[in-house]
Amino acid sequence: MATRNSSSPKPMGTAQGDPGEAGTLPGPDAGIRDTSSATQLKMKPKKVRKIKALITDLGSQYCKCGYAGEPRPTYFISSTVGKRYSEAADSGDTRKETYVGHELLNMEAPLKLINPLKYGIVVDWDCIQSIWEYIFHTAMKILPEEHAVLVSDPPLSPTSNREKYAELLFETFGIPAMHVTSQSLLSIYSYGKTSGLVVESGHGVSHVVPISEGDVLPGLTSRADYAGGDLTNYLLQLLNEAGHKFTDDHLHIIEHIKKKCCYSALKPEEELSLCLEDLRVDYELPDGKLISIGQERFQCAEMLFKPTLVGSNQPGLPELTAACLNRCQEAGFKEEMAANVLLCGGCTMLDGFPERFQRELSLLCPGDSPAVAAAPERKTSVWTGGSILASLQAFQQLWVSKEEFEERGSAAIYSKC
């Protein structure tokens, strides 16, 4: 029997409004323009009245942050943290030890670059603390003790993650209230739905997560340890095989090439038969040099369908999804899931990917008529879902206050998150 995992309220209805309309929120509570009253805590109204909750989505590439009720994040902050090498510092050195966000562009000494997440899971909590300090004091310029915070939690993460987030935010930053909830649940809320199969592929990891009536089903969830970062590395490899000389120091350039020039071919075998002149595009490097990019434009995306191209024996994303659908059949959810396959995450933003994914999944599940949806703003689906959720009146009772955490410890987290 599939296990369920959810304590969040279930917003009903379909998405309304235009995500690009300033001050308008898509989703079940479309039209919310001022969340100053919507984010009051019923438990401790005197401490968090007239404030906006801070919504955060910490991903492998970027941390998205902004206020509840807004249609999109205020800031995208790099999840990479720079630490000075110990041998580069001495007792009289007054320069910074840790660099986050735009500080990495103005570093005063050689830095060791650290990504505190591996496959979406936090592995370095000291760096996470540095990112939070940057969010509160440099990016948002707010006093943390005046704002409730909603944090997203990736699928299949250790349950101890939620406790660690609570300890960090309550004890180090003194926030008045917080809530941690499933990344996939927030993604489905961004679609204005409570049931569906969430196919998430960001920078560091991909997941296929079934959700039924607002309940996450972790026992049926699938994970693949490849995503957008691997696609970027594969593009670098392909470009070098074509005669270019890029290194890991140029990954930011390769990332830009991927976003501007690359696409997912509906039928790659037909693309291979095209004249190279029809495929080639010129790309101007930062130094002004022009390079031509041909078949690499669509070849790089093939690793999402054939991970063996990058040395992985894991199934491609459509196969991973089809296998998850088959497990849902045993649990009695297959028809519901197949009718609502929802693409989320930055890696799915590649031109042509939704159409190719739909085609491959339909070939794998011919009798299920899978319906794939791809929202225009799906790159920030987790954050948008958090913005919706924290604005719902029904959600306000699920904030965990600092006083509750001090009195009950982790039990307060697990009873509401």
UniProtKB/Swiss-Prot annotation:
The keyword Cytoplasm applies. Residues 1-42 are annotated as: Disordered. GO terms for cellular component: cytoplasm; cytoskeleton; nucleus. It is found in: Cytoplasm, Cytoskeleton. The modification Phosphoserine is found at residue 8. The keyword Phosphoprotein applies. Pfam families: Actin. Keywords: Cytoplasm, Cytoskeleton, Phosphoprotein. Its main location: cytoplasm. Belongs to the actin family. This is Actin-like protein 7B. It comes from Bos taurus.
